[in-house]
Amino acid sequence: MELKVFKDTIAAYGGRWETRLELPVETEILIPDYLPAVFKIVKCLMEPVVLQNRVSGGRWHTEGYLRCTVYYQSDEPGCRLYRTEQKFAFEKSVELPAGSYAEGPAQVWGEPEYCNCRAVSEHRIDLRGAYILCGAVLATKECELLTSLADCGIEQRTRELTGLQRVAAEEKTLTAETTLPLPEAAESVLDINGNFVLGAVSLQTGQASVQGTLQVQVCCQPADTEELLVRQREVSVQQTVELPGAAEDDMAVAWGEVMACTLTAAEGTGEADLNITWKLHLEVWHTAARTVVADAYSTVCQTQAVQTACKLLNKTADLTGRVSVVLEDDLPDPDVAVKGCFVTLGSAIPQTREEKDTEEEIRLCGKGTAHVFCADARGELTCYDKNFLWQPEGIWPGTKADACTCLGASMARITSSKTGAKLRVELEIETTGILLQATAHEALCEVELGEEYAEGSDGPALYLYYARDGERVFDIAKRYHARAKDLVTANHMETDGKAPQDLTTETACLLIPAAL
């Protein structure tokens, strides 16, 4: 008689492949003649704008530009601040190590490595620096597992494996438009940024519908004041995205980011047209369940079983909410006045929590920098940088290698002030997404039968076994090559609708009928 073996292949979690790419910058920024000449450079910022981000055919391809923004002062009296920027294009293609990877966008984040900026003339700025762009690609592993066995006196214990598989992922660049009151003639627009607040996301077969709000903040300096003011405008957006492979009962994760904004005067209306370019991130996860063989033996033959570990992702936490950060520090000069603050925000990534005498735990941690603009009595502006860490609430058991985040974060509120010589910055960070963690499950991938057991007519027909509380009936029967159902019947055990292989015992003396 031949053993019948049934197998199935499961797409399991294979880890995250990460890399760091250096984006060098060496350029000159020319100040247009219609802008005042450079007297002092106050701050230079570098920020990546990713236009293409795709994993396909064993390669990760990304392209976009670094937005290099320079804030400077002219030699005119007062705390007037001016802004100029230049885009520095980049394109990178990285060959992934041998393996299987999820198609679609990679997770991208980064931070400036260094930035040196100086004025070489009144209308020319020399910029040299580098930005570290990080990418993480989701790897998959094909696990071939046994799903059922039959004949040859085989006894098997099955279990159900449940996990999430990413079936679709998309990044789509979109535009939205609104109007604002036209800035005054001498008013300087220093920055336009914003964030996306998710309202609702729903799935249909092959597509997703997303509703939300774009909150745009326009930072400007009016002609009659030296303070930096912020005007806000909200724009409701609704978008349908084609997602082949998505189904109604899948789980969708969506977040957005504002990439660029353009403010142009509308002729004859007294208003300005605000064009917003933003990116929508969408991921669809499908819950897959498989019944596999966790253990097996034969009552008539020697059995060699091979186990393997299969890692599956499951949702651990919902990360949607707001994170508050309060920064306090002594100002280098107690007499300066705080004029305003910009924030550079980094992504929150899994980090190992360093605590002694405890099991390994992780938390999410991101970096950021508050750029605080201060003015002295002469009207000269200086930027003080205050680095900070921000953390979504929660600590989870596990390892960094088994954690996977689908998370978007953006600034929702910035407030800066001083009391005496003490600086205070209050931040609110809007987060949307989930945390996934992989759990290893043991299952059989191969079973081989050996020689048949010797005839047991001369051996005992019945054994006594003193079972401990919580022992599995299947494991006891396996020790004696007996059938689990015979053991349950002989000891009049209550099954409560469970299969004999799944029952556990109390502390008792059990009768083990020989199966040979």
Where are the predicted features?
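Gram-positive cell-envelope targeting signals
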Residues: M1-L3, C115, C310, G497-K498, ...
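Short alpha-helical segments in extracytoplasmic peptidoglycan/chitin-binding modules
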Residues: A467, V473-T489
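A structural signal for short secondary-structure junctions
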Residues: A421, D458, R468-D469, Y480
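Extracellular LysM carbohydrate-binding repeats and other cell-envelope/extracellular binding modules
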Residues: R483-L516
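Surface-exposed, interaction-prone regions with an acidic/low-complexity signature
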Residues: L444-Y466, L503-L516
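Membrane-lipid interaction segments
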Residues: E2-E451, G456-G459
